Amino acid sequence: MATPRLPHSVLRLLLCLLLMLPAARVRAQLDSLVYVSPDSLRHDGKGELRLEVENLTFLRDNEYKSACVKGYTLPGLWLMPTFTYQPLHNLQLSAGMYMLHYWGANKYPNLNYSDLAEWKGGQTQRGFHILPVFRAHFKPTRRLDIVLGTLYGKANHGLVEPLYSDENMLSTDPETGAQVRWRTRVADVDAWINWESFIFRNDNHQESFSFGLSTRLRPSRRAARMQWYLPVQLLFQHRGGEVNTTAADREVKTWLNAAVGAGFRLPLHTRIPVALTGEATASWFSQQSGTALPFDKGYGLYARLGAEVWRCRVQAGYWQCHDFITLFGNPHFGAVSIDDHSTCLKDPKMLTAHLEYAAPLGKGFAWGLDANTYAQLPVTLTHADGTTERKGMAVSFAAGIYLHIYPSFLLRRW
């Protein structure tokens, strides 16, 4: 069997991006600079009216060869301009809109985007996929945040990779509902409910919402050189409804993903900023109600080691699972094909590699790039008719470049 090679288009993209890297002096990470939306509530911002503009422009190429998912490209941007007013030192109100545009696309399916959307011919928007944005952010104490409306969601939750894919930042709608965050020296707790699909009487689809809990414990002393952390995470998704009596599909469905693990970061005594990192997690899947998915229970184990050098991060990992299905994660971490749910993988195993670079460009501006490899080891596929097929090693690649801007303009102070 021929050795899989990186596609020439990806090689050219990576070479061009690497030549653009400036000299770096401090450590940075792609998720914190490019994917995470910053809080805009300021203790000294009482009486301020501001215009805040957040934008992520991206080009991501997925050269996928796995049995789990086919390849595709995401070229485009999303833009979220909002007006914010802070009537109190601990309360901020925001209103605006979210607009998603893919280069070369003129019509957009008019539905909730929970990943790369499926085409719905008769229900479309033109030019952009547009949604209203409203957020009420209340901070009753220094450590507690309560958010209603548009949440600080997606990558802000800090979910582990088998449970949540950072690519959702490029294709999914802002999360909306309610959120509570509690932060102390030893723990960060983030709990939220995201209402994904609302139904009216006699609607033809199901309501859908998700509940999440992301906890990160930090048992190490502040002065300790090696810092440990313990992620404990939970995700539920429910689909159902009582007033949609004419819907074709009325089966109630409830699914669970959970993860626990341990990780560390160890800075080294070197002339340039260098740190070693590691993380091991165990993940679970459970079909609490319904029969839509082929498995009722499953689990997966993921371990990875890495290094942070300047503004770069490199990681290598190993994943294996049994009947595991990820609700919001990269499909490579699942044991079922998202293109054909009747095709299942028997105890799949995978090697992963990750390289990233991220840097601030100034206040409110940052950019980054990443490259990922998913090497699925030989695996047995089971099809709907009961036949089996042995599939050899499949190597998938993904690479992207991103520009994140989030400037804030003071319009008036009362």
Predicted regions: what is each one?
Residues 53-61, 97-103, 150-155, 184, ...:
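Transmembrane beta-strands of outer-membrane beta-barrel pores
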Residues 91-140, 161-162:
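Surface-exposed loop and membrane-interface regions of Gram-negative outer-membrane beta-barrel proteins
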Residues 393-414:
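Outer-membrane beta-barrel "beta-signal"
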